[in-house]
Amino acid sequence: MGSKIQVSAGNVKIGGGAEISVQSMLNIPSTDIEGSVRQAKELEKAGCQIIRAAIPNMEAVKLIPALKEAVSVPIVADIHFDYKLALEACAAGVDKIRINPGNIGSDDRVKAVADACKTRNIPIRIGVNSGSLEKEILAKYGHPTPQALCDSALYHASLLEKFDFNNIVLSMKSSTVPTMIKAYELVAEQCDYPLHLGVTEAGTERMGIIKSSAGIGSLLLHNIGDTIRVSLTADPVKEVYAAYDILKALDIKKDGVQFVSCPTCGRTRIDLVKIANEVEERLRNCNKNIKVAVMGCVVNGPGEAREADIGIAGGVGNGLVFKKGEILYKVPEEKLVDALMDEIEKL
């Protein structure tokens, strides 16, 4: 969905009608190859489809072949300023480069990177960030406005286009959600390149998920965006889970479990918070295309969750297991979760 142009990062297609892909980034020092590989495997297991790694120096380039050998998902090299790092990353077999051409020096250097990527069919993501806009653009607009982010992205793209390079993905990230949304809308009106969505410096797990859901979700609802990354000050695996939850909430991703639970009220007589959290965690890696409901009381529970394939509703020290709104049987509270999981296994 989203853009008209399609690029390929390894085996993942971005834009041009392809499914929305989920990305994350390693937060292990690039010199710790063993730790980085371990984290990459965890991300792949969680469903991450594209993994980015910071490549701050030549020593870090060694991480790329190690990651390529360890996981099957595409690897992106995140590079700033030094064009030689981009050239070495290409030679090392990276699937995609994140670099801003305007920050790497002369036209000769930009051409060298464009040529190296073109030879190997490696796309380049131009990653504009509200915290690192060019001085000229900041002087023009005064601060990182949506138009400033848009102008910066299109300027960097023009530097690559000058050398007949169009294998481009764009991102215009801001920590301010309205700014981020408007910047992407402006760029989407002016070009057909695939767009990588994200709210930069979104914050801790709680606030980061809220801001990312608002920003990424708003754009996807308007058919803007082709690949997403939820940035959190947390374990990167949680970024992947959050990204998929956003896609499920928008009904973009229809496979896998949809989990619903009620907010509780004075009728609730079981520890619904504990039960709901346990059910959600146990369903984390379930790939069945089902809707599961955990409700607080038997008065409204089965009826309110009639659209669910399977669910439970609390009583007084016990609860009901129901299917498609129809009651199956009653079990003690301590056996509710296991009973629910047993029924899910049968589906």
Regions found by a protein language model. Give the residues of each.
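Glycine-rich, proline-tolerant flexible connector loops at the mouths of alpha/beta enzymes
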Residues: 33, 44-67, 98-106, 168-177
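Active-site mouth loops of central-metabolism enzymes
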Residues: 17-35, 54, 73-81, 137-150, ...
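Hydrophobic or amphipathic alpha-helical targeting/insertion segments
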Residues: 84-125
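Alpha-helix-loop-beta-strand connector modules within alpha/beta enzyme cores
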Residues: 58-79, 112-124, 184-195, 279-281
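Glycine-enriched alpha-helix->loop->beta-strand junction motifs that scaffold or abut catalytic
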Residues: 70-73, 91-97, 118-121, 188-194, ...
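N-terminal amphipathic alpha-helix/helix-capping segment at the start of soluble metabolic enzymes
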Residues: 1-25, 281
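Hydrophobic faces of well-ordered beta-strands that scaffold small-molecule active sites
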Residues: 20-26, 51-53, 75-79, 97-99, ...
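Catalytic alpha/beta core domains of metabolic enzymes, predominantly
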Residues: 128-129, 137-284
